[in-house]
Amino acid sequence: MNTQEKHQFEPVLPQAHDDPTLSKPPIFFNRTADKGMIKRLIAWFLVHYGLADTVSMIEDLKQVGFQYATRAGISLGIEDLRIPPTKPRLLQEAHREINRMEFRYQQGYVSLVERFQKVIDTWNGTSELLKDDVVENFLATDPLNPVYMMAFSGARGNLSQVRQLVGMRGLMSNPQGEIIDLPIRSNFREGLTVTEYIISCYGARKGLVDTALRTANSGYLTRRLVDVAQDIVIRMTSCSPSAYPLISFTKSGKEVVYPLEERLLGRVLAIGAFNQEGELISGPDTAISQEIAVQLMDCDPKEILVRSVLLCKSKRGLCRLCYGWNLGTGTIVSIGEAVGIIAAQSIGEPGTQLTMRTFHTGGVFAGGVTNEIRAPHAGLVHYPRPIHPKWVRTRHGQFGILISEKIEIIFEHESKKTIQVFDAGTVLTIHEGEKVHTNQLIGEIPAHGTLVTGWRSLKSGVDGEVRFDELELLKQRPRSDRTSPVRLDPRVCNKAHLWILQGHVNTFEMPIQLVANIGDKVEKDSIVSTTKQVVSEEGRIIYRYDEKRGKEQTIITHAFGSVQFDGVDAWLPTKSQGIKQSIRTTGGKLSISSQGMTLSATKIKQEGIGSFDWPALAEPSIEEDEELEEAYKKTKDPIIQPTPYPLQYCVLPEQKYVIQAQEGWIISVLGGQSVGASQSLATYVDSQWEVEQGQLSIRSIEYRVHDQSWIQVITPSLVEIESGRGSYHLMAKAGWIIPISTKIRCKDYRLISGSILLGKWSLPISRFAVEQAASYPAILIRPIHTYPVYPTTIWDETINWQRGIASIGSNDWHPRCIAPTYQAPSYVESFKGRQTFTGEEKQEGNKPVEITSKNRRKSAANSSHETRMTQNRTWPIVLADTRIQKGASPIQIEWTWPHAKNPWISPNHGAIAGHIRFVNMTILDSSSISTKQELDHREAQVIPTTQTVSGVHRLTPLLEKTVFSQDDGEIQRMLPFSRALVKPVRTNRSKTRRNASGKTQVKAQARSQAKARSVRLKLKETVKTRSQEKFTNEMKKQLAKSSEGNKGFQIRQALFPKKLIRLMVVLRPVDIMTFATYGARVCIPLGAMIYQGEELFEGASTPISGQLIEIRRDRVTLRIGQPYRVGWQSRLMVTRDQIVKAEKVLAHLLYFKTKTGDIVQGLPKIEEILEARRKKGNEIIRSNLQDFVQQFYQDNLDEGFSRKYASTRTMRAMQVLILRRVQLVYRSQGVQISDKHLEIISLRMTSRVLVEKAYGTGILPGEIIEKRRADMLNQGRTRIRYCPIVLGITKASLTTKGFISSASFQETTRVLTQAVLQGKSDWLLGLKENVILGRLIPAGVGIYGHWVGPHEFNIKQMLKLWVLPPIITGQSTMRAMFHSTTRYWQDLEAVMESPNKLYPVTPYKCYPDTQHLAGLSIWMPEFEFRRFETFTEEEMVAAESLFTAHPNCHARRINNKQLNSLI
């Protein structure tokens, strides 16, 4: 009984009587007696009046109870279930709150997790308020209501069940243990709907099935505990321990779950205790009663020294004082008490009861993350003094004020005034002068507990395209390597929005050629592909992969290289892997084309154009290991073609152009500068352009790249753009190029200086048009100023990238850049091309504008319009059997142009260089050959990019291989393979020159061999190429020779590992919404994302969220979209512009919750601790006992402690840890178990050690023996090196010294077989062994034995009881057993000099009738009946040896006095 209960339970004492016969005054209790009250009454009575009086008092209570029970009965009718009248109002308020949250979620202001937590908390709060109203309603209207009386009697039923009857059933959890955010609003009185009934079945399953299953588990736990502790019996009064433990209160977080006063009750003080005045409260070796505990607590101690089971020195069993009270009687325990069995039952039995309770606490999801603060009453909020607020976001998505110091807040209502004090760390959601209502949530206090993180999947609600809004990804560089490139992490490092723009997604499988183009209008059931798949909806195609391109159409393809993420799927999805195949044949023969193979004997011109973007989550950036590809063609179309990339809308009526640009990087580098490999100089720009009758409007969004190694300073300036509707004041960033012309034919560009900060005045924009001009000026704005944080590192590697219009210098770095820097061509963004600005001479079309590098293109003197291509091929410079770098030099294209040009602009002749990656190959021979070929083109042709794949990285773009025909310059192109490595398995090349004498001179020969593995698909392709080479000999006579070579290709991985899905988005009428503006000014720029409720045009807000895709004079059109808020550290699973279907996982959102102490987790948790299980998987925090033991032991050794002392310290620490962990689980469920029971179990779990080395003992390394025995052996000449271990209760039971107990527990056959082979002995020391053999158990009175008196005793019985219990062995004779000395003396725990001395005194006899026990014999000692004095000296030595051998006896010579003390 604790102090609180004692104060609650104070008997009413009447006045003192004069009658001297009354020894104790009568006591009168005047209060309602419920279950808890009767409990306390019995406990108090037992302490004050003893056991006998308590029994008779309980009998009287029983009679009174029965008497009153028959006076009146309680019936329960359906009318007794009264629903409180406040329920409809509470439900209405909850619905209103949740609808408000849902609206904020649709607007994108709160995330999925914040909405979920708000819903859970709202229903939880409603349920709790309703529960209070149920009680108040019963008290006010009918205090004698049968339901109310039952709930509060404590006999059966409780308030949570009554709440379900007349309140609301509340929240349920699903089979995974997660809360379902749809609560059961009804109660059982009203009846459940079908949905509610289905949901409630989850909870019912927990109640019925789980109880049945877990009761068995709990019973098994009890059985194991009994087995491990059954032989622990109180065997002596005091053991004189050398050390005592300090005990203090047990805390969970900041809450004290096991007060010190409770822990002290029933323990024995180790030393005397004095109060603050120096008076003795209690002496040493005194039991701590309730009164002494209260007096000790008045001194406010932090820790107290007591005697403990863990430090008892008794050889076997325990002593009375170390154990303390028998908690059943409140007195010191008696000798012979089987405390091990009591401890096992005390721990195991509550587990059985706990399984009966299954908790459905609503707050498991965010259980205890915060404690809520509610308003005491309605009124106005007033802050008496100003505070310095720190704005934070609460877990419900609201903005709150985090207070850093203690403050007071006043709530005023008419004449009523309440002052409430809030501690530092509180988050308040109310402001000065705000009006609050009663019980309104005004703040929260973060809970101090172990927070665990969880992930919740955000799924798309509709089909459509992904867009990011102000999203920043984490950029990281490995700490170990400062020179390695920065990698993008898929984690979000800010709070931003992810949009899904609605549209119907159609799916096509790979071999289909699409008929419809971007911008085409399609109707329902129209043909959009060659296989006549039909579109299910009407609409306009706005986005399509792998569009069909004509010869004169602009082609811009882009491939980005490998970006590797940790923690994402092994294969990142790429946005498209489209392939366009076109095959031209000559000679009238038809060639066969298949997906992965081309076989034709005719001359084939084949074009394969890939359409793809960067892999998911990777933003485009130039890095060390990336492969870039550009290919351009001239266009001669009379109007501007829309870009084949994400395009919102394009219409060309009445010379009005509305064009959406593709997002891209602007690399802010002028000619001659270098770009760092981390690409921090890049600014990401998302531009929308509108050109309408001479008016221009621009809106740009800037993306900053987070990098740990760079600081960025951006100098803004102001641009004013004039238009018919008024002026736009835009903040232009350095790095922009602003087009300022009014016509498409020719553009003029003006510099926005990064170093001039423009103020409030406007910068007028000139309008002019040039019909035809020789040059097109464009100026790039100064780059972002970049200041390095770390000192410059020079990187020695050189890489040459050469292209037709720009080449990249090697060994060129900028002194301000960190780590490796390479020079790259700098492109700027246009509204047409991916990385080009547009402008075409005498044409309305596109042409790349390029900021040149300092290595200018080569110019020739002659003036002609022909293109000459020089191709250099270098075969490998081979070292035998070594890993070499194969450098394939790029193709250089030289051309001449007669006109004088502006150096900033280069005309596009359609000739583009290829660049070939470096490939590591193992070549098996050592010769090289070099050839140079020249091809003359009579007309300009596009040379597609040659690109090979190194196979080093996991994620590489499509492989494209170009084979140059040697006949007349026609290009033959291989099919591209996705992530495939196609290498020639065997290649022979030879050139033969024949001269007049007919001798053959071999110029050079090269053979390369490479091995390729086939992953999914084995295809063999044999291509026969016939080529004619012209040779000239010395006699000017031309001979032609045909050479044939067979190439065998093995494809390492198939073109498409599964299948390519082509996707097409169709914008249907239901996906867009048009609003009439009535001439009002539109507030939002074209292409902007607009959130529900924002102002669309003057005086009107939008009822939906979406993107503005069209502005007309009298109306605007929105494309419907859904914004999703993604928070900090969320993991993205999609990339920008990806097409997704409904229910696709977009991101995983992070949330926090506290560890809950639900008993559903509780029982397995207790089992896990007591079994000392090692958890599987990689834990961040080590929590299993095995790891703790090793770590703690090592730490002690490192501190310089000896092995023995380090082991002892480790064992003590583990005992305390086990005790604390189990107590926390039980206490969290309100179950109270005394420490001493857990101490007995933890003592058994930590009493053994693992032998590492044993010298001269016969003990093998890896054996588990008792620590006490190891220390005893170490006292002699032998040396055992051991380390501490923690054994689970099952393992501890199976490794006991006696094998009968182990065999009866588990694995009977194995244990008995092992015992026979090892010749084990069982000394029958425990209770279980004796019960099995039908002997008297060594507990209770059986522990004393029977003898006549101090001197008239029976030596045979004395030795039998104290010294030699029966020995059970598998040996055939006693002598044989004695002579297998190693094992036998191991079990006897000491080595005797001469075992032969035993025989005259202790002849053993075998009892043949006992051989039924698995072939084992029982040997019983036989002694003659004579007095102790008649023993000879020799016999005395033998008897002394027996005492020494027995675990309970000390090694000493025995005389009368000592023998008497044993008795």
UniProtKB/Swiss-Prot annotation:
Cofactor notes: Binds 1 Zn(2+) ion per subunit.
Bias type Polar residues, positions: 860-869, 997-1007
UniProt-listed Enzyme Commission number(s): 2.7.7.6
SUPFAM superfamilies per record: beta and beta-prime subunits of DNA dependent RNA-polymerase
Annotated Basic residues bias: 987-996
Protein's UniProt keywords contain Ligase: no
Region (Disordered): 836-869, 987-1007
UniProt GO molecular function: DNA binding; DNA-directed RNA polymerase activity; zinc ion binding
UniProt cross-references to InterPro entries, sorted A to Z: DNA-dir_RpoC2_beta_pp (IPR012756), DNA-dir_RpoC_beta_prime (IPR045867), RNA_pol_Rpb1_3_sf (IPR042102), RNA_pol_Rpb1_4 (IPR007083), RNA_pol_Rpb1_5 (IPR007081), Rpb1_funnel_sf (IPR038120)
Chemical reaction(s) catalysed: RNA(n) + a ribonucleoside 5'-triphosphate = RNA(n+1) + diphosphate
Main location (coarse class): plastid
Cofactor requirements of the protein: Zn(2+)
Key words of the record: Chloroplast, DNA-directed RNA polymerase, Metal-binding, Nucleotidyltransferase, Plastid, Transcription, Transferase, Zinc
Positions annotated to bind Zn(2+): C239, C312, C319, C322
Subcellular location: Plastid, Chloroplast
Gene Ontology BP terms: DNA-templated transcription
Top-level taxon: Eukaryota
GO cellular component: chloroplast; DNA-directed RNA polymerase complex; mitochondrion
CDD domains associated with the record: RNAP_beta'_C
Keyword Chloroplast on entry: yes
Homology family: Belongs to the RNA polymerase beta' chain family. RpoC2 subfamily.
Assembly mode: In plastids the minimal PEP RNA polymerase catalytic core is composed of four subunits: alpha, beta, beta', and beta''. When a (nuclear-encoded) sigma factor is associated with the core the holoenzyme is formed, which can initiate transcription.
The protein's role, per its UniProt record: DNA-dependent RNA polymerase catalyzes the transcription of DNA into RNA using the four ribonucleoside triphosphates as substrates.
Protein name from the UniProt record: DNA-directed RNA polymerase subunit beta''
Organism of this sequence: Nephroselmis olivacea (Green alga)
